[in-house]
Amino acid sequence: MTKTKGEKINKSAINEVVTRECTIHLAKRVHNIGFKKRAPRAIKEIRKFAEREMGTTDVRIDTRLNKHIWSKGIRSTPFRIRVRLARRRNDDEDSPNKLYTYVTYVPVSTFKNLQTENVESSDD
């Protein structure tokens, strides 16, 4: 999906429900972090990435993603990770946020030539 001259890339409105698949380069985000803080920092960086990418302050991380981050221990986080970011409507009536972002882990064999892409949303 390359951009030709004069073509604009579509950005979704903040208030609509959308699902994207992205690759996060965790190694550069936990570089120069002490060993005992790497996995917790990786979770915080995923949260920050999702917040910036989707424009919602309420970010929820799936347990499979959390287990994958912690699978090699506290100090050896994966170098890259493929995630699916789903912006969803909040069912809770008294919540201050109308939308939240749900981050799930997407297993891939290789990270070569992967780009951010919109996915047809499927409610898991």
From Swiss-Prot:
CDD domains: Ribosomal_L31e. The modification Phosphotyrosine is found at Y102. Keywords: Phosphoprotein, Ribonucleoprotein, Ribosomal protein. The keyword Ribosomal protein applies. One of its GO terms (molecular function) is structural constituent of ribosome. The keyword Phosphoprotein applies. GO terms for biological process: cytoplasmic translation. It comes from the Eukaryota. GO terms for cellular component: cytosolic large ribosomal subunit; cytosolic ribosome. Belongs to the eukaryotic ribosomal protein eL31 family. PANTHER family: 60S RIBOSOMAL PROTEIN L31. This is Large ribosomal subunit protein eL31. It comes from Drosophila melanogaster (Fruit fly).
